């Protein structure tokens, strides 16, 4: 039996990188997309996957461009001859108060964080057979909570669960499942960016409101995504699963 193949966008760091390593440990080959302007070295993901005993091909990708996304899926087929899973993880995060919001900032955010998910799933589905699985990474910012000075980000992330629910129904006759993951506060390079996100101090402060007493790790989100693409979740589709250490169910003090 041929090993399965997963396509991951935003695989150079954070959740995407952790997922690539998790897949490697379970024998799944990885085709990862990375944004060329991203400061993180994509070779680091390749090295970690190889250390875990897996195979990974990292290719440049702009999820804001349909041709780029289509090319990634086609290259996955050329390299491995099949595509079983697709995880839309790539995302943009920038702080922008409403009164400073420009149409360009708004459009860029939705183009990457929402339309980019659609592009990824559209490209992957063209090559998937029955038993395929799609997972999109949303956020509690928009998916559950609001977030001041990030209305464009929250709007995009709020749209992801709706997209996944609709695609779950549409793609079910093809034997393809589609789910969303809604992470809470997870320590990643993106969340550690104090200019556009919480930063180290903000994360430490926020952790005090989390019932489990800490922020999450990228590998913990990766484990959930891996479950959602596995046969262990074969009857699960159209769902949006929050992974936040209990933050969104805590009663106010």
Describe the function of each predicted region.
Residues 28-43:
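Conserved glycine-rich Rossmann-like NAD(P)H-binding loop of the short-chain dehydrogenase/reductase
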Residues 121, 156, 164:
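Active-site helix of classical SDR
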Residues 12-13:
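Conserved glycine-rich cofactor-binding loop
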Residues 97-98, 105-110, 202, 206:
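Substrate-binding pocket helix/loop in short-chain dehydrogenase/reductase
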Residues 139:
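Residue(s) in the substrate-gating loop at a strand-loop-helix junction
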Residues 126, 169-173, 234:
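Alpha-helical segment proximal to the catalytic Tyr-Lys
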Residues 144, 226, 237-253:
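Short C-terminal tail/terminal secondary-structure segment
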């Amino acid at each position: 039996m041929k090993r399965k193949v997963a396509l991951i966008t935003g695989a150079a760091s954070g959740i995407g990188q952790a997922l690539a390593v998790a897949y490697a440990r379970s024998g799944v080959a990885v085709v990862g997309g990375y944004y060329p302007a991203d400061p993180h070295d994509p070779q680091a993901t390749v090295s970690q996957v190889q250390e875990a005993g897996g195979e990974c091909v990292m290719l440049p990708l702009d999820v804001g461009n349909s041709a780029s996304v289509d090319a990634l899926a086609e290259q996955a087929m050329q390299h491995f001859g099949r595509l079983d899973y697709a995880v839309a993880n790539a995302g943009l995060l920038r702080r922008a108060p409403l009164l400073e919001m420009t149409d360009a900032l708004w459009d860029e955010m939705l183009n990457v964080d929402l339309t980019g998910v659609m592009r990824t799933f559209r490209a992957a589905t063209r090559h998937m057979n029955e038993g395929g699985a799609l997972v999109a990474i949303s956020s509690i910012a928009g998916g559950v909570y609001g977030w001041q000075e990030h209305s464009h980000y929250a709007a995009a992330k709020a749209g992801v669960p709706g997209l996944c629910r609709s695609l779950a129904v549409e793609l079910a006759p093809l034997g393809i499942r589609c789910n969303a993951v809604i992470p809470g506060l997870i320590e990643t390079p993106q969340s550690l960016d104090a200019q556009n996100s919480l930063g180290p101090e903000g994360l430490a402060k926020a952790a005090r409101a989390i019932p489990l007493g800490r922020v999450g790790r990228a590998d913990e989100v990766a484990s959930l995504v891996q479950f959602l693409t596995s046969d262990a979740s074969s009857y699960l589709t159209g769902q949006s699963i929050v992974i936040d250490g209990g933050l969104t169910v805590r009663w106010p003090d």
